[in-house]
Structures are given as structure tokens and as C-alpha cells.
């Protein structure tokens, strides 16, 4: 998908341009598909929506909206969600709701910022931002990775290890002519 995936490639490009420095990856605001699935897997949860709220400097808050099964106790559900290692590193608040579907928005985003040094020149600042439909972009990146997989030796790869041109449809020569 896009993280890990294309975000890893962008982070690598930022580091290529400023090898010494620090990169902050700030997700959101938006729906985290992975965190929503993890919250829904908690006993007593009928449906869940986890929103990622950027707090800056690579830190995040999680707002988790849950539809409870009949008889489920909010305090137990909240404790189970907060104890999950997937949520443990972030400030997490759990809200009971009548309908998760009424709140659902498939939007998400990311803002990556790098401050670093290129050679001897300090104070380089880079910024990459996107606002997306989470499932649509995830699917697109997966299709591109599947395309690239046909051009790789057998094995397991991260998107960072695959030449970008292998992810694109079309003739490599034409792509180079158009993109360079």
C-alpha cells in the first residue's frame, strides 16, 4: 500500500537529498484501515472506525468509534483496545456510537517533513503531502506492485527494493523519455 510502500520510497528520496537529518511522518487526519480492523476484532465490538489525528513531529492520536455488541461493556472494550500493541504507542480515546457507518469517511493523508544537510549545506527543508481516498490508493499501489513483481526474480521485496519504472505500465524507453 502507501504506508508502508510509497511512503517508504518518498522517505528514501528525502534522505537521498539530505543524508543527515530527521524525517517526521505525520499521518491523517483520516481513517486508518489497519487500526479500524484491529478495533473491530476486539470482543464486544460490532463495528469500529479508528481515525488518525496528527499531533506533529511524527506523533499521533487515535479516535476510535465503536458500535458495541449487546451486553458489551465500554470500559472492557476500551481497555482491550488500549492494551493492543497497535494502539499502545499513541494517545487513544474510545467513543461509543450508534452507527459507525454514519461516521465513515475513507479519506486519509500524510505529511512528511525532513530537515537535514546536503553535503556541507545545512538547513535543507523538504515537505511531501497528500490527501487521499485510503482504499483506492492502497489498491492502486498494490496493482503497481503486482505489475512490478512480474519483472523481479522470485522472492520477497519491499516497494523500496523495486525499481520504480517496473511499477509503471508502458515501454521503459518511452517512460524515460516522458519522465526524465
Please place each PLM-identified region on the residue numbering.
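Short alpha-helical "patches" and their helix-cap loops
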Residues: 22-32, 79, 153-167
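C-terminal substrate-binding/catalytic lobe of Rossmann-fold NAD(P)-dependent oxidoreductases
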Residues: 25, 30-147
Amino acid at each position: 500500500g502507501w504506508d508502508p510502500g510509497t511512503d517508504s520510497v518518498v522517505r528514501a528520496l528525502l534522505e537521498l537529498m539530505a543524508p543527515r537529518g530527521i524525517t517526521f511522518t505525520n499521518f491523517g487526519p483520516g481513517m486508518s484501515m489497519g487500526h479500524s480492523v484491529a478495533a473491530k476484532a476486539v470482543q464486544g465490538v460490532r463495528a469500529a472506525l479508528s481515525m488518525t489525528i496528527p499531533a506533529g513531529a511524527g506523533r499521533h492520536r487515535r479516535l476510535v468509534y465503536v458500535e458495541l455488541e449487546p451486553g458489551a461493556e465500554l470500559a472492557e472494550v476500551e481497555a482491550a483496545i488500549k492494551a493492543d500493541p497497535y494502539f499502545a504507542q499513541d494517545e487513544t480515546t474510545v467513543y461509543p456510537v450508534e452507527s459507525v457507518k454514519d461516521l465513515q469517511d475513507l479519506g486519509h493523508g500524510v505529511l512528511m517533513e525532513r530537515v537535514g544537510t546536503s553535503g556541507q549545506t545545512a538547513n535543507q527543508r523538504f515537505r511531501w503531502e497528500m490527501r487521499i481516498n485510503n482504499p483506492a490508493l492502497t489498491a492502486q499501489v498494490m496493482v503497481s506492485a503486482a505489475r512490478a513483481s512480474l519483472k523481479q526474480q522470485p522472492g520477497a521485496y519491499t516497494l523500496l527494493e523495486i525499481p520504480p519504472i517496473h511499477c509503471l505500465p508502458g515501454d521503459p524507453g518511452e517512460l524515460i523519455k516522458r519522465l526524465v
